[in-house]
Amino acid sequence: MVANIRETELSDFERVIGLLRQLWPDKELNRNSLLKIFSTCIRSPDNIYLCAEIDGHVIGFCSLVVRENLRVEGLVAHIDELIIDEPHRRMGFGAELLEAASAAAKKKGCKIVELDSAFYRQDAHKFYSKKGFEKKAYLFSKDLRS
């Protein structure tokens, strides 16, 4: 079975929120805040939001941010979220969505597509390595909300 990969629409929001709950099970999601960000990002030329669907049902989501980068002397696409619905994992849909995301980034003129992944997501790390991604750096983060 092959997924239909398409640009995300505002009407996909509720399903995407359900997928994000799987990606971040310990995070309390603020629906109103996320809706505002989601609706802005799907219209921005600096973002690529893709959904994977089977029989009209969204089973996957990927978001990328495109930006200029001095290191690569051009555009870089960063994958912020990539999630496949739990019952549909290990069926090739993640690979399809990742390939579509890479193709969309290339079409926008990006030289590199990159992502970060939590240390505990060992299966995801193996998946990304198999798909040609190389471990290049650690991500350091500082919370500025307090």
Regions found by a protein language model. Name each.
Residues 41-51, 78:
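A short helix-loop-beta-strand connector motif used in the catalytic cores of GNAT acetyltransferases and
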Residues 95, 119-137:
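Conserved active-site alpha-helix within GNAT-family acetyltransferase domains
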Residues 68-79, 89, 136:
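A conserved beta-turn-beta hairpin within the catalytic core of GNAT-like acetyltransferases
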Residues 105-116:
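Conserved GNAT acetyl-CoA-binding A-motif
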Residues 17-39:
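Conserved GNAT-fold acetyl-CoA-binding loop/helix
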Residues 2-16:
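A short beta-loop-alpha structural element at the N-terminal edge
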Residues 51, 57-66, 83:
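Conserved beta-strand in the GNAT
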Residues 84, 90-103, 130:
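Conserved acetyl-CoA-binding loop-helix of GNAT-fold acetyltransferases
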